[in-house]
Each structure stands twice: as structure tokens, then as C-alpha cells.
Amino acid sequence: MLPNEVFLSHSSQDQDFVARLVETLRRHGVPVWYSQTNILAAQQWHDEIGQALRRCDWFLLVLSPSAVESMWVKRELTYALQQNRFENRIVPLLHQSCDFDRLSWVLASFQFVDFQQSFDEGCRELLRLGGLGYQPGR
């Protein structure tokens, strides 16, 4: 069931997709921790990320070629995989085809939510996890 708060791990190069996803999730009542809106000027961003990872109870991972190359995405995922509270609460979101094994071979065992063909269908599937329902344009 979605969530008290979800952590959204992503590459900054996927900003357009991620901003659209965050807006959609928030419109559907899902509280999202997202670095672009949750880290304020003059804050220590690495400390803020760490605090959010410790606080959030779901981990959404946006997968793309740039995410696979991101040191921070890899660090965030490694942390999430080590936390019991994220068991069955790590959801890979396939934004673009990529070699996700480079992040972690464990990802092959997860059920992905595929956004490659349709953003709306991807959102519908993701929100179904929490029984929140999805209404395009909401």
C-alpha cells in the first residue's frame, strides 16, 4: 500500500519525466520526497537525502541510461536494498530502456512498472499498488 512518503531516486538528466511523475503522484495524494522540491538553498543536500531515505517507507527508482551511470542513484539504491522497511516496497520505474543490472543484479527479481509506451498507463499501474486509482489529467 502506498505510502506515508515515497523517496524518488532518479538522475537529474531525467528531470522532465520525473517532474511530471511527481506532479501526478502528488495530485493523487501521494506524498513524494523529491530532491528538486525538498532540498532548499543552503541545505546540505547529501544530509537531506540521507534523512529522507531514513524517513520514507517506499522507494521508487526511475530507470534510464543516465540513472544507471549515476553514482547517487547507485548509493540510494544500495541503501534501500539494505533496509528491511523497504522489503517489497522498492519499485523500479522503467522510463527508458537501460542495462539496469549495472546498478544491481538484484533488480532483475523486481516487478517493474513500465512507462516506456505510455505515461498514463505507467501511472495507472503504479497507483494501483496503493489502491489509489488513477484518473488521467488529475
Annotate each language-model stretch with its function:
Residues 98-109:
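Glycine-rich, charge-decorated loop segments at or immediately adjacent to ligand/cofactor-binding or catalytic sites
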Residues 4-6, 108-111:
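Short amphipathic alpha-helical segments
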Residues 1-62, 66, 71, 81-89, ...:
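Conserved N-terminal substructure of TIR/SEFIR domains
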Residues 109-126:
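Output/docking surface of receiver
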Residues 90-92, 112:
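Conserved beta-strand scaffold positions in the cores of enzyme catalytic domains, especially
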